[in-house]
Amino acid sequence: MVQCRPPQEFSFGPRALKDALISCDLALKQLYTSAFSPSERLFLSEAYNPHRTLFSTLLIHSAFDWLLSRPEAPEDFETFHASLQLRKQSLARKHIYLQPIDLSEGLAGCPLLDHLRSCAEAFFLGLRVKCLPSVASASINCCSRPARDTDGLQLHTDGILSFLKNNKPGDALCVLGLTLADLYPHDAWTFTFGRFLPGHEVGVCSFARFSGEFLQAGSSIPDSALLEAAAGGPETLPQEGGQTLCYSALGMVQCCKVTCHELCHLLGLGSCRWLRCLLQGVLSLDEALRRPLDLCPICLRKLHHLLGFRLLERYKRLHTWTRVMLEMWSGQEAGEPSVSEDTLPFSADSGMGCESDTEPVTSPSEPVTPDAWSHTFPDGPEPVSEEGLSSLAASEVLLKLGGPVDALEEYRQWLDACIQALEREVAEEELVQVDAAVDALGRWEMFTGQLPVTKQYMPCVKDNVGLRRVLGDKFSSLRRRLSSRRLAKASSSQCHWGAEN
């Protein structure tokens, strides 16, 4: 794989980022001013402030990154707002349902579900997240096949999506199936992290690829008080011979990322191409690990428009969830090396997998990409393409994952900085200064979808008569030689023809 060393920045420029957040439409500008306080607007202005400190510019790490492999028009707030008029989804329904598949009610399932539920309720503040009773995959009419790159069977997503659609609760805003089984959406694809059914607000995601190095051996159960405070302990998977495997904190965070990513798409948010964001697509496990656990300001405004929470309250809830998670895992993984943006583990499928992120017009979610090893694509768009973390050419993860507690601690410190920024008193003059500085900048040139105009060559002012005469004589001589050869060849052919007759 071609790596960019160091990673290259990708940005649309401050002016475009400001328009994506606030919009050029007068009504949407007024909506922005009325919906947020001055401190919230200054916080959100980090999206387009060239001196931002809380949010980061997108980085391209390889030539196979999702951003380069899936070029599409980014979804700004104005586009998102217009798409809501086409959706039949009713936000009067305040329940998100998680449907476990082959997750038992014992230690193998409940702690994981409790972690995901508590994270989702903090992330989607104002919505209630409920867990449905677990169902067996054998009771679902879905196809299966042997996995191509791992041991075990893979489940076809279409059968699961049909089951979720037919069994969707009446008060459900959306339903997301969760499974530890590997999934595949199409025979030509190796696997997918997630998929959804447009127009029905049902989806399914798999945590199968967050196993192996994401698991740590363990025989003890965390303190019961912490389990109660955090709504569950580390996920445990019973193994043959009585051995127990537990998700590391990093593995649990990845499961939370996938779940919240999928739920955002089910609520109507499209993929993000503006800043580093949870709603970025991924084409490899490396990209999934680098993706942050929260939204950029542009996507945060979209979610705020749907749910109407206060930004400060949401970040405080996420901070509480992160603190409890840290208390549960601190000490268990203290001896592991740390993982940072620059020292991420390298996987064999890096840059060769595929998350889906080509959104249909009627849905903000992305279709999954075919097997990147063969680079074969199915004919026509997939009618049920869901968002995506689809990684199609993934093989075994050949990395040593470490420092998951450090990753959670870094997220907690970032939440601290967000809370401090939102608690600060801000005057309108400070906002005016930031906006004026950005408005004074020129717009960056971007591809408009039109090919460049053919360059017109101006005639030379000075015409060299001597050179033109020499070239003319040369070409005339060449023409005479070619003509004489053609005549000689034609006469020779006639002689041969007469001799044969």
UniProtKB/Swiss-Prot annotation:
Chain positions covered by the region annotation Disordered: 349-370
Top-level taxon: Eukaryota
InterPro entries attached to this UniProt entry: Archaemetzincin, MetalloPept_cat_dom_sf, Pept_M54_archaemetzincn
EC number(s) given by UniProt: 3.4.-.-
Cross-referenced PROSITE patterns: ZINC_PROTEASE
Cofactor note: Binds 2 Zn(2+) ions per subunit. One is catalytic, whereas the other seems to have a structural role.
Residues involved in Zn(2+) 1 binding: H261, H265
Swiss-Prot/TrEMBL cofactor(s): Zn(2+)
Active site per the UniProt annotation: E262 (proton acceptor)
Keyword annotations of the record: Hydrolase, Metal-binding, Metalloprotease, Protease, Zinc
Signal peptide range in chain numbering: none
GO biological process, one term: proteolysis
GO molecular function: metal ion binding; metallopeptidase activity
UniProt-annotated binding residues for Zn(2+) 2: C272, C277, C296, C299
PANTHER family according to UniProt: ARCHAEMETZINCIN-1, ARCHAEMETZINCIN-2-RELATED
Family: Belongs to the peptidase M54 family.
Function description: Probable zinc metalloprotease.
Designated name of the protein: Archaemetzincin-1
Organism: Rattus norvegicus (Rat)
